[in-house]
UniProtKB/Swiss-Prot annotation:
The BAR domain is important to associate RAB8A (or RAB8B) and RAB10 to endosomal membrane to promote tubule extension. The BAR domain is also important to recruit WDR44 to endosomal tubules. GO terms for cellular component: cytoskeleton; cytosol; endosome membrane; focal adhesion; mitochondrion. Residues 265-369 form the PH domain. Pfam families: BAR_3, PH, RhoGAP, SH3_9. This is Rho GTPase-activating protein 26. Residues 383-568 form the Rho-GAP domain. Residues 584-618, 638-696 are annotated as: Disordered. InterPro entries: AH/BAR_dom_sf (IPR027267), BAR_dom (IPR004148), GRAF_BAR (IPR035483), GRAF_fam (IPR047234), GRAF_SH3 (IPR035481), PH-like_dom_sf (IPR011993), PH_domain (IPR001849), PH_GRAF (IPR047225). The keyword Phosphoprotein applies. The modification Phosphothreonine is found at residue 670. It comes from Mus musculus (Mouse). GO terms for biological process: mitophagy; signal transduction. It is found in: Cell junction, Focal adhesion; Cytoplasm, Cytoskeleton; Endosome membrane.
Length: 814
């Protein structure tokens, strides 16, 4: 597990969790500094002690082999894994060189010692100086704050205002120092990935020059050296991009910290001074307090930054009432009283300022809670995935592929913003939608056209690959097994809405054509991933963790481009269950990790050879085939009985197999046989046995036979074969446009759902969400704003500020 990311928004809160996270980063820097010192010492010993060359080299190799890199985040890219393993590779090379009894080492001091000393003194030393400054400002701020809060409210207003201004200045300075220190720590942690390894690589290269007997070994080392150099350069390039993004975020936090505050599960949190009664008077103890409006739970953690830790046990109480203290009733300022259900007496608390007290009062006195809004930083504009949107993208793609497919830096070089906006305004004109592709784009530069395409995708109300699936795509990219990555992303793409998937397919086919011409345009698959990753998978909120995930967004786009034919033209296999994924990861981790040069996917690499298409093995037995033939014959006879079907029937949507509405209505919510496939993640409404529409009666008459036959087959199959049943049914859906009637709910239920207002509902059973669009809950949970969803058998409701899908027969309306 890597180091947790340090969020700039936590600098303002200065919470205990933030302090603990900061300590872990400081400990890692101290460990790195200590290791560099030891490495430098061993290197000097290697240069000076030729007689003990063998033992010195083995000690040096052992030191390299024992050190482990710690990267920010919960997963590593292929480049980072390659760099992290490089020290072990170096150790193995040194052991082999020891067998050859090499005796000559020259220029090792300049190549190895000087850069490491420079990194340790300039980078780690700067981080230590920043820590001293940060600790000093922490003590100064806390002392000033305590002194300020001890001022009597009876003093003159001018004196109080002057004191308030002074505290604000000290607080602002402390906040800026905190941000700069966090930024420096993040920078050093990222720099060590390349500034630390590069000198070692150069040192090894120097050794190969003077070792005649190591020539063959150096030749064998060439492939790994090349891959490692690419990985280091890629890491350096990502660092430059990430550093600018983090620096931009830090500046935004300085200008408006509240706007970029991270989403918190608590309605309100922060430091409060709690009055504690003693035998002789009272004392005020600093606590870090959190409050949840839904449960009315107040948690108080005694914590003082100056002492460096907790001062007692945590305490949680249930809020009964909250009342502001009158100014003349207590000497302290900014005070309010809290009554608890499970604790006698009144708890008097002191906020840090008048504004802070107002926020706490608003959160506790029954007013509407203040939540962080997930505002998209991109302008929504009027961009939509409609006919005009598809026309715009097709026109841009046509212009690029006919006039500029070989232009260097395609999609990387941006056009002039004013011309891009002008082109977009022309393309988004409804009149332009009917014109041919070349009529509009022929007069524009290719870089303007490519910038217009990217800008239009960024102007969509949400990213093309949707917020709700973003974490799933990132998790898929973090899987160690390449085949599992592709399989997971394949499954996720087919869970996207139809228009999103069509647009994504159109774009990926085009990007594959661009990558095929990379020798002319210099845009490899990896480079295209860097360009389109943040656009197609832009984060919902701007945080350091989101910036760190950009590298995995790029990997997702690479996989989509390289496997676009398989992903978009074939139906995904049954997704792995959580247990299978865990087993797959365990097997992958237990086996010896492959050499860096043999990994099939890196963040930046040349276009790989064409992958062989995987042949899918059929799992449908003879029973399923008989069901298919019987159902087809009945449907054909039924369609012949309906020559006068409404013309609108042909446009009705075909049911998607991701959520069949024919499953039993009330399975046991804790059934151990319930699979983790999203199709069976929750029950749906039962099948209708009759219909009020005479036009659909012949089709509906087939329902009993088809679903009875399917049910008989399903009961005899293992869960892993269930996907084949619905794949079979989908095969003859296009031939019978009215087949969707088999899956429809009764018209009465539809009318009832559509007329149902937003209401509250209570959960009858517990349910664990299988994907991001669903809600997890326990029995007895109460949902707000419950209303019908577009998914048959599912409702949409809100729980703890999150909106998602709820199984219809798991709840009852209140």
């Amino acid at each position: 597990m890597g180091l947790p990311a340090l969020e700039f928004s936590d600098c303002c809160l200065d919470s205990p969790h933030f302090r603990e996270t900061l300590k872990s980063h400081e400990a890692e820097l101290d460990k790195t500094n200590k290791f560099i010192k030891e490495l430098i010492k061993d290197g000097k010993s290697l240069i000076s002690a030729l007689k003990n060359l063998s033992s010195a080299k083995r000690k040096f190799a052992d030191s390299l082999n024992e050190f482990k890199f710690q990267c920010i985040g919960d997963a590593e890219t292929d480049d980072e894994m390659c760099i992290a393993r490089s020290l072990q590779e170096f150790a193995a090379v040194l052991r082999n060189l020891e067998d050859e009894r090499s005796r000559m080492i020259e220029n090792a001091s300049e190549v190895l010692i000087t850069p490491l000393e420079k990194f340790r003194k300039e980078q780690i030393g700067a981080a230590r100086e920043a820590k001293k400054k940060y600790d000093k400002e922490t003590e100064k701020y806390c002392g000033t704050l305590e002194k300020h809060l001890n001022l009597s409210s009876k003093k003159k207003e001018s004196q109080l205002q002057e004191a308030d201004s002074q505290v604000d200045l000290v607080r602002q300075h402390f906040y800026e120092v905190s941000l700069e220190y966090v930024f420096k720590v993040q920078e050093v942690q990222e720099r060590k990935m390349f500034e630390f390894v590069e000198p070692l690589l150069a040192f090894l290269q120097g050794l190969f020059t003077f070792y005649h007997h190591g020539y063959e070994l150096a030749k064998d080392f060439g492939d790994f050296k090349t891959q490692l150099t690419i990985s280091i350069q890629n890491t350096r390039n990502r660092f430059e991009g990430t550093r600018s993004e983090v620096e931009s975020l830090m500046k935004k936090m300085k200008e408006n910290p509240l706007e970029h505050k991270t989403i918190s599960p608590y309605t309100m949190e922060g430091y409060l001074y709690v009055q504690e009664k003693r035998h002789f008077g009272t004392s005020w103890v600093k606590h870090y307090c959190t409050y949840q409006r839904d449960s009315k739970q107040i948690t108080m953690v005694p914590f003082d930054q100056k002492s460096g830790g907790k001062g007692g046990e945590d305490e949680s109480v249930t809020l009964k009432s909250c009342t502001r203290r009158k100014t003349d009733s207590i000497e302290k300022r900014f005070c309010f009283d809290v009554e608890a259900v499970d604790r006698p007496g009144v708890i008097t608390m002191q906020a840090l300022s008048e504004e802070d007290r107002r926020l706490w009062m608003e959160a506790m006195d029954g007013r509407e809670p203040v939540y962080n809004s997930n505002r998209d930083s991109q302008s929504e504009g009027t961009a939509q995935l409609d006919s005009i949107g598809f026309s715009i993208i097709r026109k841009c793609i046509h212009a690029v592929e006919t006039r500029g497919i070989n232009e260097q830096g395609l999609y990387r070089i941006v056009g002039v913003n004013s011309r891009v906006q002008k082109l977009l305004s022309v393309l988004m004109d409804p009149k332009a939608a009917s014109e041919t592709e070349t009529d509009i784009c022929a007069e524009w530069e290719i870089k303007t056209v490519t910038s217009a395409l990217k800008t239009y995708l960024r102007m969509l109300p949400g990213p093309l690959m949707m917020y709700q699936f973003q974490r799933s795509f990132i998790k898929a990219a973090k899987l160690e097994n390449q085949e599992t990555r592709v399989s997971e992303i394949h499954s996720l793409v087919h869970r996207l809405p139809e228009k999103n998937r069509q647009m994504l397919q159109l774009l990926m086919n085009h990007l594959a054509n661009v990558a095929n011409n990379h020798k002319q345009n210099l845009m490899t698959v990896a480079n295209l991933g860097v360009v389109f990753g943040p656009t197609l998978l832009r984060p919902q909120e701007e945080t350091v963790a989101a910036i760190m995930d950009i590298k995995f967004q790029n990997i997702v786009i690479e996989i989509l481009i390289e496997n676009h034919e398989k992903i978009f033209n074939t139906v995904p296999d049954v997704p792995l269950t959580n247990a299978q994924l865990h087993l797959s990861r365990k097997k992958s981790s237990d086996s010896k990790p492959p050499s860096c040069s043999k990994r099939p996917l890196t963040l930046f690499h040349a276009v790989p050879s064409t992958e062989k298409q995987e042949q899918r093995n059929s799992i449908i037995n003879s029973s399923l085939e008989s069901v298919s033939s019987s159902a087809n014959s009945i449907l054909n006879s039924s369609s012949s009985l309906q020559p006068n079907l409404n013309s609108s029937d042909s446009n009705l949507d075909v049911v998607k197999p991701s959520r069949p509405s024919s499953l039993p209505p009330n399975p046991s919510p804790t059934s151990p046989l319930s699979p983790s496939w999203p199709m069976f993640s929750a029950p749906s409404s039962p099948m209708p046995t009759s219909s009020t529409s005479s036009d659909s009666s012949p089709i509906r008459s087939v329902a009993g036979f088809v679903w009875f036959s399917v049910a008989a087959v399903v009961l005899s199959l293992a869960w892993s074969s269930l996907h084949a049943v619905f794949s079979l049914l989908v095969n003859f859906v296009p031939c019978h446009p009215n087949l969707h009637l088999l899956f429809d709910r009764p018209e009465e239920a539809v009318r009832e759902d559509s007329s149902t207002p937003f209401r509250k509902a209570k959960a009858l059973y517990a349910c664990q969400a299988e994907h991001d669009s669903e809600l997890s809950f326990t029995a007895g949970t109460v949902f707000d704003n419950v209303h019908p969803s577009q998914e048959p058998g599912w409702l949409e409701g809100t729980l703890n500020g999150k909106t998602g899908l709820i199984p219809e027969n798991y709840v009852e309306f209140l």
